[in-house]
Amino acid sequence: GMLIAATDSQAVTLEWALSCVLNHPEVFKRARDELETHVGQDRLLEDSDLSKLPYLKNIIYETLRLYTPAPLLLPHSSSEECIIGGFKVPRDTIVLINAWSIHRDPKVWSEATSFKPERFEKEGELDKLIAFGLGRRACPGGGLAMRALCLSLGLLIQCFEWKRVGDKEIDMREESGFTLSRLIPLKAMCKARPVINRLEK
């Protein structure tokens, strides 16, 4: 069950990430330039390249911030009476964390609703991201999910030219539910780049 849930949330996040970079051509170009510099067009991106691609990783972080796949993190139970945000919470109370709201809070993030992957170049910004939870109860698959997402998005950027369908920006409205899916599924046009042709030979 856990693996299926992880696969679903990764697919949802990848769709959001591609939507974001297609709406922000300057972000797409910077990610492509980073890939060209460190990987090139003679071979495919590999897992071992990811440590040299901080901007690609920041795109995923920023996507997870704005479009957390599970907007309400897994429920927790208070082990003892405590105060949360000024509210008295009795022992054994189910507590939900609204990551979606925290990730868009202007008191926590500058330009909170803007897609800006470069924000994670600043010291301490990553510590505020709670897409995988925090501490001992954080998602055990967070590291694996990050690698899979970076590799997938990186390969899509490396191997294909991408264009939006028409001139209008991609609709970024969300569908409410257990996972934060797009209201309108992403439609985009792609064309293979030379690296694909080289691999076929």
Walk through the language-model features, giving the residues of each.
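Conserved, non-catalytic sequence blocks in retroelement Pol enzymes and Pol-derived host proteins
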Residues: 4, 45-54, 83-87, 121, ...
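Cytochrome P450 proximal C-terminal region
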Residues: 36-38, 124, 132, 136-138, ...
